[in-house]
């Protein structure tokens, strides 16, 4: 940077001079006018201040941030009791900072000091413990030696008289023991004292050991009790704790020694025969009683009694409730009569019959009111089971190619950029030069395979862009360097953020002279997209689809981002994916574009997509070449489905055709219920609210398109055209050629028949020519929308616009035998016409509205009188004209309105 004026600096960075002066003043710089010179140092100061304001420290922070995303699965228990596999996505962000040598040295020194201090404290503590242990051992040894010496002394004193035995038998004499010396009183007292002391010591040691054992037992029991929250476990622990048997380990062992039969006897229950225990309920007890009576020779009174008895307690059922349920089915599940359920619903304010359907929340309230347990279940249980089985059959996950979606505003060069990458010419063959379908392609580069999804940029294709963001790993946001951020650019940013997808910005059209990438970056910053070169985390590539500039750099950024994300998928097991687009081709049937996300799709697989299922009869890549299999992140087109599924539907390969039919039928039923609900007639409250109001004009439309995505976009765009004065109603819409039934429907409903990228078949053309039905064909979406707007404008009521032509003031009133009151007037402004409507104003208040009966200039009858001239006039049907009244002549023009 060099020294320059504030004006030159503002021009170079593309910012207003006033804004730059304000930022310089906030940064503490002395510049106050546009001609003041700012030095290089002052420019650095300003840049550092702006970085600090926007959340970045000045200078090089020496930090690098890495973002990683890992995907795994976990099994959880579902409401039906079966395990359910869910996807778990963990996103990590690690920031690595360059270490500071001084900081490292200080931390190492502090750590060494802390370790030395801890080591010294540990040594001191060990020495104190060793000393205390030695003292305790010495005291115990001294006590034990004293007790042993006293015991030996007592034993020696008792055995000493017995040892003195005199043998006097010499040749036949008798042997007599020596006489026992008499024990003195002092010796007896000493011996008794030693014995009592020894017993007391042993008793104290035994009592202490028992108390310690009891304390340990109770502590273990309290820990076990804390693990259980039910009252029975707590009560059991409390009983054991309070019982006399809990005085030690013997009590616990005594309690655990009871078997099941002994416990029944101890608690006062009846002892049951082990064999009879196999029979349950009252019937088993009766048979056991009969056996016992027969053993005693007695006759049983219950031998001939019926085995079933009416339950005394009310049965409580677990009632499974889906998203909706019929009233009769709900009553059957609770084993009650339908009228009881209807009574309960009437108390809740719902008037229904037994064949009507109620929602899940209402049904749950009814079940609780009737005293049963509602169990809320999902209507998609069969689908969840299929997905769970498919997940369990998957093999080891490996690295897969990234799926990249190209998004941006219309005419910013998305398809042209993709053509440059693919070395093809797709954009040249598109109607109007704009993309109106999602296109899927995969490109093989030197560093790997990349799958691209090209989305439309027109405002009507919002749902397409949202689907593209959900099915992708990386979003490449294309912004024209000469146009900047536009509405669909901001919308694409919102879709990417909602899907949690990383963004790479590609500034296109860099070869143009009007390219201004700095302005584009400034506008992106306002949308919180901060590029890496400005301290953010969004990679930016400056490219040109026309010259090929920056294409390699863009591909490198995509591959680096995919490596950081660690994208993985399993190539084994049943295939799983998403429908990108679907259409109906004549002679081929439904053609479905699929992006495989997991597993491998093969020819002959049974595919379930939305509410349709079928076997794959043929499969081709995006170029139309036949293939036999497709792995993860590969887009393919398949044939074999009976009808075109909706774009965005999940695709799954199943092994059981019966399960596939059940899931498809359930989805079709749900879709039909939603459609009937949307198209149902107005309810009573809506009819009452609309009474007294005029009928709103309606433009009826029968729509046919080539693909599902375009059909969805056009339906949404046409519904948004409706206003309070005129409505647009799509009578019928579908994918494929216009048929004879469409012409008949358009004739009966007085609808406009529109075809987008489709044509009418022979029967439909003959029928339309015969009945005079006009069929309109379109290939560009905004042309179709403009024509519908014109049709709506024709239904609008015309606007009546008034224009004041002239004003005359009454000067004198005369009486005429022919006209009654005649006024002599002076034309104040404009022109007074004889054949135009007039108003009579008195004190600027309208008192009469009508027309002139006569207009004369002197005695001549004239058609008009200009300003500044006198005239005489008579008002038809009004004679109360007074002087100073004003006669206002006006004209009403009918103006055709438009939207």
Curated annotation (Swiss-Prot):
Function: One of the essential components for the initiation of protein synthesis. Protects formylmethionyl-tRNA from spontaneous hydrolysis and promotes its binding to the 30S ribosomal subunits. Also involved in the hydrolysis of GTP during the formation of the 70S ribosomal complex.
Protein keywords: Cytoplasm, GTP-binding, Initiation factor, Nucleotide-binding, Protein biosynthesis
Chain intervals for the UniProt region annotation (G3): 454-457
SUPFAM superfamilies the UniProt entry points to: Initiation factor IF2/eIF5b, domain 3, P-loop containing nucleoside triphosphate hydrolases, Putative DNA-binding domain, Translation proteins
G2 as annotated region, ranges: 433-437
Pfam families linked to this entry: EF-G_D2 (PF22042), GTP_EFTU (PF00009), IF-2 (PF11987), IF2_assoc (PF08364), IF2_N (PF04760)
NCBIfam families, sorted: IF-2 (TIGR00487), small_GTP (TIGR00231)
PANTHER family, per the entry: TR-TYPE G DOMAIN-CONTAINING PROTEIN, TRANSLATION INITIATION FACTOR IF-2-RELATED
Domain tr-type G residues, every copy: 399-568
PROSITE patterns: G_TR_2, IF2
Name assigned to this protein: Translation initiation factor IF-2
Compartmental location: Cytoplasm
The UniProt record lists the keyword Cytoplasm: yes
Highest taxon in the source lineage: Bacteria
A GO cellular-component term linked to this record: cytosol
Region G5: start-end pairs: 544-546
Similarity comment: family membership: Belongs to the TRAFAC class translation factor GTPase superfamily. Classic translation factor GTPase family. IF-2 subfamily.
Region feature Disordered, mapped onto this chain: 115-137, 170-189, 262-309
Residue segments, region G4: 508-511
Major localization class: cytoplasm
Annotated spans, G1: 408-415
Positions that bind GTP: 408-415, 454-458, 508-511
Any GO MF annotation of the entry: GTPase activity
């Amino acid at each position: 940077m060099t020294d320059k004026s504030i004006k030159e600096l503002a021009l170079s960075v593309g910012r207003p001079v006033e804004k730059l002066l304000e930022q310089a003043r906030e940064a503490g710089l002395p510049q106050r006018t546009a001609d003041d010179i700012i030095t290089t140092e002052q420019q650095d100061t300003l840049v550092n201040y702006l970085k600090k304001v926007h959340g970045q420290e000045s200078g090089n922070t020496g930090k690098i941030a890495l973002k990683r995303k890992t995907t795994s699965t976990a099994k959880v228990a579902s409401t039906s009791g079966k395990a359910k596999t869910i996807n778990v996505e963990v996103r990590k962000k690690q920031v690595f900072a360059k270490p500071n040598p001084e900081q490292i040295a200080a931390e190492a020194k502090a750590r060494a000091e802390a370790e030395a201090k801890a080591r010294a404290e540990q040594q001191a503590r060990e020495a104190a413990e060793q000393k205390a242990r030695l003292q305790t051992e010495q005291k115990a040894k001294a006590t034990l030696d004293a007790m042993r010496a006293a015991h030996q002394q007592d034993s020696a004193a008792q055995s000493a008289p017995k040892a003195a035995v005199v043998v006097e038998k010499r040749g036949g004499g008798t042997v007599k023991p020596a006489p026992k010396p008499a024990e003195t009183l002092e010796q007896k007292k000493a011996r008794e004292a030693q014995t009592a002391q020894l017993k007391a010591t042993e008793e104290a040691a035994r009592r202490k050991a028992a108390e310690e054992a009891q304390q340990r037992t109770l502590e273990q029991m309290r820990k076990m009790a804390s693990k259980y929250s039910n009252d029975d476990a707590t009560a059991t622990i409390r009983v054991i704790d309070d019982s006399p048997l809990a005085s030690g380990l013997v009590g616990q062992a005594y309690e655990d020694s009871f078997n099941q039969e002994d416990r029944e006897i101890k608690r006062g229950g009846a002892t049951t025969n082990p064999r009879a225990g196999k029979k349950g309920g009252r019937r088993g007890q009766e048979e056991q009683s009969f056996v016992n009576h027969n053993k005693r020779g007695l006759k049983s009174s219950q031998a001939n009694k019926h085995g079933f008895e009416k339950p005394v307690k009310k049965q409580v059922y677990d009632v499974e409730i889906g998203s909706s349920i019929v009233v009769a089915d709900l009553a059957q599940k609770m084993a009650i009569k339908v009228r009881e359920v209807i009574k309960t619903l009437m108390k809740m304010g719902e008037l229904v019959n037994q064949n009507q359907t109620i929602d899940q929340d209402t049904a749950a309230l009814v079940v609780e009111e009737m005293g049963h347990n509602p169990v809320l279940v999902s209507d998609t249980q069969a689908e969840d089971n299929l997905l769970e089985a498919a997940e369990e059959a998957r093999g080891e996950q490996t690295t897969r190619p990234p799926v990249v979606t190209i998004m941006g505003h219309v005419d910013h060069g998305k398809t042209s950029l993709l053509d440059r990458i693919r070395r093809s010419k797709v954009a040249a063959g598109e109607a109007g030069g704009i993309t109106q379908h999602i296109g899927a392609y995969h490109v093989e580069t030197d560093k790997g395979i990349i799958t691209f999804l090209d989305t439309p940029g027109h405002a009507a294709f919002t749902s397409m862009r949202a689907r593209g963001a959900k099915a992708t790993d990386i979003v490449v946001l294309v912004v024209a360097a000469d146009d900047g951020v536009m509405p669909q650019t901001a919308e694409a940013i919102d879709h990417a953020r909602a899907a949690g997808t990383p963004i790479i910005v590609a500034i296109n059209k860099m070869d143009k002279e009007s390219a201004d990438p700095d302005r584009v970056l400034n506008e992106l910053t306002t949308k919180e997209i901060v590029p890496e070169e400005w301290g953010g985390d969004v990679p930016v590539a400056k490219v040109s689809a026309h010259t090929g500039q920056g294409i390699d750099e863009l591909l490198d950024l995509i591959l680096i981002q995919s490596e950081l994300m660690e994208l993985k998928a399993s190539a084994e097991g049943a295939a799983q994916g998403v429908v990108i687009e679907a259409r109906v081709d004549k002679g081929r049937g439904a053609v479905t574009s699929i992006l495989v996300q997991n597993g491998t799709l093969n020819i002959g697989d049974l595919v379930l997509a939305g509410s349709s299922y079928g076997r794959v009869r043929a499969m081709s890549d995006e170029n139309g070449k036949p293939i036999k299999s497709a792995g993860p992140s590969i887009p393919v087109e398949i044939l074999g489905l009976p009808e075109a599924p909706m774009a965005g539907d999940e695709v799954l390969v199943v092994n059981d055709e019966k399960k596939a039919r059940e899931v498809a039928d359930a989805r079709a039923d749900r879709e039909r219920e939603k459609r009937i609900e949307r198209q149902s007639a107005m309810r009573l409250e809506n009819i009452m609210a609309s009474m007294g109001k005029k009928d709103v004009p309606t433009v009826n439309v029968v729509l046919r398109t080539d693909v599902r995505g375009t059909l969805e976009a056009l339906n949404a765009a046409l519904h948004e055209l409706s206003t309070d004065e005129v409505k647009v109603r799509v009578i019928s819409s579908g994918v494929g050629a216009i048929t004879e039934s469409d012409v008949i429907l358009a004739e009966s409903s007085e609808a406009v028949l529109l075809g987008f990228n489709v044509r009418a078949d022979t029967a439909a053309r003959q029928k339309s020519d015969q009945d005079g039905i006009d069929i309109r064909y379109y290939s560009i979406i905004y042309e179709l929308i403009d024509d519908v707007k014109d049709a709506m404008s024709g239904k609008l009521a015309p606007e009546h616009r008034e224009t004041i032509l002239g004003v005359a003031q009454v000067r004198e009133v005369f009486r005429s035998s022919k006209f009654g009151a005649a006024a002599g007037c002076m034309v104040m402004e404009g022109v007074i016409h004889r054949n135009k409507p007039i108003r009579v104003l008195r004190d600027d208040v309208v008192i009469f509205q009508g027309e002139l009966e006569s207009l004369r200039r002197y005695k001549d009858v004239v058609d008009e009188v200009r300003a500044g001239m006198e005239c005489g006039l008579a008002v038809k049907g009004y004679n109360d004209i007074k002087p100073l009244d004003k006669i206002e002549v006006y004209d009403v023009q009918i103006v055709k309105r438009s939207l």
